[in-house]
Amino acid sequence: MKHKLIDDELKYLDERSRDIFRHIVEAYLNDGGPVGSRNLSRLLRQTLSPATIRNVMSDLEHLGLIYAPHVSAGRMPTQSGLRFFVDAFMEAGDLPNEERENIEAQVKEAGHAQSVEHFLVQASQVLSDLSRGAGLVLATKHEGTLKHIEFVRLDGEHALAVLVTQQGGVENRIVHLPEGVTHAQLTEATNFLNAHIQGLTLSEAKEEIARLCSETRAALDHLSHHLVETGLALWGGEGADHKIRLIVRGRSNLLEDVKAEEDLKRLRHLFDDLETRESMAQLLDLTDEGSGVRIFIGSENKLFSLSGSSLVVAPYRDSQQKVIGALGVIGPTRLNYARIVPMVDYTAQLVSQLLR
């Protein structure tokens, strides 16, 4: 969907202005630096003098599409200019067959693993390797079906509650033991839970155990009953951000683009944001607003607005077409959008297929 800004600015740009603007942006995407009028005159299809090109560049600068990073420098696109370029000029082509086959082979191989976590980590790694940016996966902690729960005594006051899902996930929690709990009571609570929770999701298991406990209170002694109720209560009750896993691979790739102290500050902001993982649920909501790939450039990306980074992200869905996560590439604003957009889109489609 085009921004109104795009439609307004297209009215003022003739073919010559568009051609010059496009070459300025493409030069920036290639090497990250400004381009001057002399270099542009050699790149353009039309024969134009440097003076004529400078006049056009002045008009583009007045429109807020380009700027000079310092006096007597060439011109670079502004954030608005990059958005204008992406929406008005960029054509996302098809992935080369070699890259398509590479993504498919690696993602499908990881899909054979029992652990969904391993599968998503590999998807993030594939995106990082191919994009030379950082591959990012946001995954909701979807409810797998339960296979086994066990209490393992640690000391007189604590036990380790171990939950295993049929999808291969394992989670551990420390539970405080009521005074006087015996080994036999731990075993009784474990056996009771495992007799009734297999094949259920966690929320279904909680409802079922609550119902059974009210009906069979006499069948369990007081301490065993307490363990059964607290055993399942340990999981859940988390805020929205904590129900989302953030997987990032390829942070070191971002260091390759560092050219100045300002770049280091930008990266520090980005790494801090990735570590704190605040408001990740908001990003997941943003991906759900569209049907395909979303591109967030610079401050458009509210999560990483201080880092001067761009994010190309797409949702992946379950069999009911519900968004259950998102994946993408984060990097400098001079990402190769035309190449990365189809890469992210295809990977999201593969992940959706394999998780159904």
Curated annotation (Swiss-Prot):
Family: Belongs to the HrcA family.
Biological process, per Gene Ontology: negative regulation of DNA-templated transcription
Protein's job: Negative regulator of class I heat shock genes (grpE-dnaK-dnaJ and groELS operons). Prevents heat-shock induction of these operons.
Keywords assigned: Repressor, Stress response, Transcription, Transcription regulation
Gene3D superfamilies associated with the record: 3.30.450.40, Heat-inducible transcription repressor hrca homolog, domain 3 (3.30.390.60), Winged helix-like DNA-binding domain superfamily/Winged helix DNA-binding domain (1.10.10.10)
Pfam families: HrcA (PF01628)
GO molecular function, one term: DNA binding
UniProt protein name: Heat-inducible transcription repressor HrcA
Protein encoded by which gene: hrcA
Superkingdom field: Bacteria
